[in-house]
Design a protein with these regions (language model features):
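Outer-membrane beta-barrel transmembrane domain signature of Gram-negative proteins
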Residues: 214-216
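Hydrophobic membrane-insertion alpha-helices, especially the h-region
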Residues: 2-16
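Terminal hydrophobic membrane-targeting helix
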Residues: 12-83
Length: 393
């Protein structure tokens, strides 16, 4: 009965109080380091936490902005708890707080940077009579983040990124919750991805992308089991392509101009090098859907046929190949890119089908091998590398 009476007497009576000068000065000085003005408010009261204790709340608002952080806490001689929350807050590059931070930490490698989205934060920790070590959890929620920028004259854009990183632990042991990342669209270095999503597992020492998928060239691109060591980002991975549009895919091959129809499948091997600062294409293999007929109409086949002169083809033979590629119905289309020594590579194109010359149909069984530097054969633009390095190659 005595304990109950004490509990009733010590039930929280929250009263606004002045923030202690030491705490207020610390909050204001930390905000001032970022060029911001903070307005702290506090309330205190009493509570019963396996014994008499103190409870209260602290709220810090950034002046002339929607940014707000609030904390609730309670403690006694036996146990304590604390919770921090930042309500969902919309932001953009024109937000006063964001603008101040960008002025302090400018992004020099890009221009025309615009972005928007919303973010929320929650965290809590406690130590009770039954759990003598602190138990904690934290969650950051990012919604509908979109950004666009220019890097070395090339546009990059990301729209609709949503992800919720979360972690929990006991004392200093950390368990990071698996994340599911979604992005509505990505445009970078001439490549467009739609409906990107990825499952990611993060530990204190590594990142594992268990699966990722996106719409690409009217089809699908998939990635499986990409392991990243943050201290050494040199790694390789394979992209699997399924049911992509042949016409869209061939626009990324230098020398291709014209129209194509049909669906392609295959895989592309890529490497992260120089600590993740550059992406290098290794090998690639694409093939048409077996049993289906596609169309190939090259408006300028000369870039693909000029290399035949080095293989001993005379002008008439090269002209016949060029004529065939201007109006071709193919049953087999294969592209095989093989990286050689240094920057050299070979692009092998195999086409089987029927070419139309006026009213005459001619069977075609052709393999073209084009040698050159890899970046000349495939129009990757190395834009991702240039963005990270901040320079043009």
């Amino acid at each position: 009965m005595i304990g109950l009476a004490v509990a009733v007497l010590l039930v929280i009576i929250a009263l606004p109080v002045a923030v202690p000068p030491i705490a207020e000065n610390l909050i204001r000085s930390k905000a001032a380091e970022f060029g911001l003005s903070a307005v702290p408010q506090m309330s205190l009261g009493y509570c019963w936490r396996n014994g008499p204790g103190i409870a209260g709340s602290l709220q810090v608002k950034i002046k002339d902005s929607p940014w707000l952080v609030a904390a609730d806490f309670g403690a006694s001689c036996s146990e304590w708890s604390a919770a921090v929350r930042m309500p969902e807050t919309a932001f953009s590059e024109s937000d006063p707080v964001v603008r101040t931070l960008l002025a302090k930490y400018p992004v020099t490698a890009v221009s025309n940077l615009t972005f928007s989205g919303s973010v929320a934060l929650s965290a809590k920790a406690e130590r009770t009579f039954h759990t003598p070590v602190p138990v904690w959890s934290a969650k950051l929620q990012v919604k509908d983040f979109s950004a666009s920028l220019m890097a070395k004259g090339k546009p990059y854009a990301l729209a609709g990124l949503s992800v919720t990183p979360a972690a929990r632990g006991i004392a200093d042991r950390v368990d990071i919750t698996p994340m599911f990342l979604r992005v509505k669209s990505i445009s970078a270095a001439g490549f467009d991805l739609e409906g990107f999503h990825a499952s990611v597992r993060v530990s204190e020492k590594s990142v594992l992308v268990t699966e990722a998928s996106a719409g690409f060239c009217g089809g699908q691109v998939n990635l499986y089991s990409l392991f990243l060591d943050p201290k050494n980002l040199n790694t390789g991975f394979t992209l699997f392509l399924d049911d992509i549009n042949a016409g869209e895919a061939l626009t990324h091959v230098n020398g291709f101009s014209g129209e194509a129809s049909g669906r392609l499948h295959g895989k592309i091997k890529l490497f992260l090098r120089e600590g993740g600062e550059s992406v290098r294409l290794s090998d690639a293999f694409l093939y048409s859907t077996p049993g289906e007929v596609g169309k190939l109409r090259l408006s300028n086949p000369e870039p693909l046929t000029d290399n035949l002169a080095l293989a001993g083809f005379d002008d008439d033979a090269r002209a016949n190949v060029a004529n065939a590629l201007t109006d071709l119905d193919y049953s087999v289309l294969r592209l095989n890119l093989r990286r050689g020594e240094g920057k050299s590579a070979t692009l092998s194109t195999t086409v089987r089908g029927t070419a139309t010359r006026g009213e005459v149909s001619v069977p075609v069984d052709l393999t073209l091998n084009v040698n050159g530097e890899l970046e000349q054969l495939v129009n990757t633009s190395l834009g991702y590398s240039n963005l990270l390095k901040g320079k043009q190659k």
